[in-house]
Each structure stands twice: as structure tokens, then as C-alpha cells.
């Protein structure tokens, strides 16, 4: 199964953070913060305006982005965890 978002939605692969502290303590899954950075892996075609014209999305596949802690819906595609959200839920692109 592959996944293609519709309209103004994007699919993001979260960038996982280190699972150990600097002191060597392993952080259990239940105590981990939800990652708020990720890489765009798929984008929709955009939304239609009042004239019926498609307004394309600004984000592109491969962009590294910063998003809200509770943004989007988590899904699993081919065993890979993804987050689907609207482009407007993204705060910005990380250079």
C-alpha cells in the first residue's frame, strides 16, 4: 500500500530524537516526547479556490519541517510511522 494525501494535506515521517540522555540513561517509550520535526514524504495537489483553480502547496517532498506537538493524525504505511496533517499545521521549513 502506498499513500497519496488529498487536497492540502501532507504526510510527514517524524525525525526521532536520541533515546539516551547524555548521562547514558535510556528513555522508555512511555516517557518520550512526541517529535515535532519531520521530513515531508508526500504532498497533496492543493486546494481549489472560488474560481475552481488549484492552489498548489508550498511544501515539497524532502522538506524538513517543524510542526505542533499535537498536529495531525498518526498512520502506519508499509510498517512506517507517518503523520498526516494540513499544510497550515506546519510552522515552517528547517534549513
Curated annotation (Swiss-Prot):
Cellular component per GO, a single term: cytoplasm
Stated name of the protein: Co-chaperonin GroES
InterPro entries, sorted: Chaperonin_GroES (IPR020818), Chaperonin_GroES_sf (IPR037124), Chaprnonin_Cpn10_CS (IPR018369), GroES-like_sf (IPR011032)
Organism: Rickettsia bellii (strain OSU 85-389)
Keyword Cytoplasm: yes
Quaternary structure, from the entry: Heptamer of 7 subunits arranged in a ring. Interacts with the chaperonin GroEL.
Role: Together with the chaperonin GroEL, plays an essential role in assisting protein folding. The GroEL-GroES system forms a nano-cage that allows encapsulation of the non-native substrate proteins and provides a physical environment optimized to promote and accelerate protein folding. GroES binds to the apical surface of the GroEL ring, thereby capping the opening of the GroEL channel.
Family in the record: Belongs to the GroES chaperonin family.
A Pfam family recorded for this sequence: Cpn10
Record HAMAP family: CH10
Keywords assigned by UniProt, alphabetized: Chaperone, Cytoplasm
GO biological processes: chaperone cofactor-dependent protein refolding
Sample GO molecular function, one term: unfolded protein binding
Compartment(s): Cytoplasm
